[in-house]
Amino acid sequence: MEVVIIRVGELTVKRGLTRAEMERLLLRAAREAAEECGGARFEKEPGRIYAYGDVNCLKKALSKVFGVKSVSPARVITYQKITDIALEAADLWSGIVAGKRFAVRVHRVGEHAFTSREVAAEVGAVLVAAGGRVDLEDPELEFYIEIRGNRAYFYTEVIEGPGGLPLGSEGKVLALVSAGIDSPVAAWMLMRRGAHVDVLYCNLGGTITLRHALEVIKRLLAWSYGYNARVIIADCGPVARAMRRGVREELWNIAFKRALYRIGVEIAKRLGAIALATGESLGQVSSQTLQALAAVEAGIDMPILRPLIGMDKDEIVKHAQKIGTYELSAKLPEYCAVFSRRPRKWALREEVEAIDLALYDAITEVVNNAKIVRKRELDEFIKALTPPHDIEIDSAPEGAVIVDLRDEESYKKWHLPGAVRAGVDDVLALVDKLGRDKTYVFYCYSGGLSLDVAESLRKLGIKAYSLRRTRNAVPPSSQGERGN
């Protein structure tokens, strides 16, 4: 019979009611993961869980369940004597061992009339007879046999799981996720420590950017077996507009991060979360210096968890690649209207108070209008997002007005030939001045804002596009700070 062996990690050191509850949570998550494979039958023993079903599918799904140390697809038999084990091993492995160096690893649990070494010797003998050569130090093939009671499990594959604690064993956290590289990793790391993680995404772009971000979040939540996580989508446009009107540009980075914290706290309280989580890494960008972090969290009455605080970018990227979000995150367009070209790394208390006052109404509006989508509804929600299919183009049509949405200094250093400059708040005035019957093509540092502006103008009946190629055409020295 085919089975998947599930090994648990930290859970084994727990005792009593705590362990029983964690086992319940892990089994609940495992059952949800198994639904992707048509379901499974589970059996539990001390230190092991066995899943019977579509083994090839289950080994992949169950290796993404938090609390699982590793899994192995295996063949299980009921034996009566040691020769039964050797015969099964010969049947399974004789066909692949010829001419290969191999090792037999045996693990036993319980009382038996033989030792692990005796089993290894018996199995090794039949595999040598099949043309293999024993090499315990540097084998080409490793054959594993696990013996528990009168059952023997045969396997060759050990697939690493995420480890950690079962999801839901450590309370609820609201993660501020931009869908860039860092913040999904931070959310994943807290999920790994047993937290139920809901996600807050602050949308500053149009439908295309939102869809892309939700695909990243969906990839993250593919790990959240056992919890139908909430995705809170907040239209943060009001905050960006209020900030540009009422906050000095050098403080935009700090102001926007602080607004995110304020929005997060209010939504977290409504959801019953007891902490916020962010993807900040100390010193990575100007808004993540100690001085800046002290300014943005001053007066915030909720714990702020920063799992990445001591990691460098290379470490974070490796984690993102491991959990499967990196490729999508790296392609996410950035909104470039809320980052200062010369950001301040600190703020005085009175400046922070002024920021709170300037953004209070906008923050309230964002919180009250936020949408909540459950993980299981996310696919349908994404499918329902229908941006114009032709909004991104590679070159401007003849006679089109090309509009540079970057700051004035960057425009002076470099811009596309014939382009005019306009800030995001000036776009409508520019269109009214030049005529709504013209075609407008926008570009920005990396595309997020230009997509958003083009889509917004199309809703007003104006022919507008975002220029795709400028994402790589804008000189790196002109590009704004990338958020988390």
UniProtKB/Swiss-Prot annotation:
Pathway involvement? Answer: Cofactor biosynthesis; thiamine diphosphate biosynthesis
The cellular component terms of Gene Ontology attached to this UniProt record, alphabetical and capped at eight, are: cytosol
Keyword Transferase assigned to the entry: answer is yes
Q: Which reaction does it catalyse?
A: [ThiI sulfur-carrier protein]-S-sulfanyl-L-cysteine + a uridine in tRNA + 2 reduced [2Fe-2S]-[ferredoxin] + ATP + H(+) = [ThiI sulfur-carrier protein]-L-cysteine + a 4-thiouridine in tRNA + 2 oxidized [2Fe-2S]-[ferredoxin] + AMP + diphosphate; [ThiS sulfur-carrier protein]-C-terminal Gly-Gly-AMP + S-sulfanyl-L-cysteinyl-[cysteine desulfurase] + AH2 = [ThiS sulfur-carrier protein]-C-terminal-Gly-aminoethanethioate + L-cysteinyl-[cysteine desulfurase] + A + AMP + 2 H(+)
Superkingdom field: Archaea
* Name of a matching Pfam family: THUMP
Domain Rhodanese residue range list: 396-479
Query: Keywords assigned by UniProt?
Result: ATP-binding, Cytoplasm, Disulfide bond, Nucleotide-binding, Redox-active center, RNA-binding, Thiamine biosynthesis, Transferase, tRNA-binding
| Chain positions recorded as ATP binding sites | L176, V177, K257, G279, Q288
Q: Name one GO molecular function term.
A: tRNA-uracil-4 sulfurtransferase activity
* SMART domains, per the entry: RHOD, THUMP
Q: Kindly state a single biological-process term from the GO annotations of this entry.
A: tRNA 4-thiouridine biosynthesis
- So where's the catalytic machinery, residue-wise? C444
Q: What does this protein do?
A: Catalyzes the ATP-dependent transfer of a sulfur to tRNA to produce 4-thiouridine in position 8 of tRNAs, which functions as a near-UV photosensor. Also catalyzes the transfer of sulfur to the sulfur carrier protein ThiS, forming ThiS-thiocarboxylate. This is a step in the synthesis of thiazole, in the thiamine biosynthesis pathway. The sulfur is donated as persulfide by IscS.
Write down what this protein is called. tRNA sulfurtransferase
- The source organism is Pyrobaculum aerophilum (strain ATCC 51768 / DSM 7523 / JCM 9630 / CIP 104966 / NBRC 100827 / IM2)
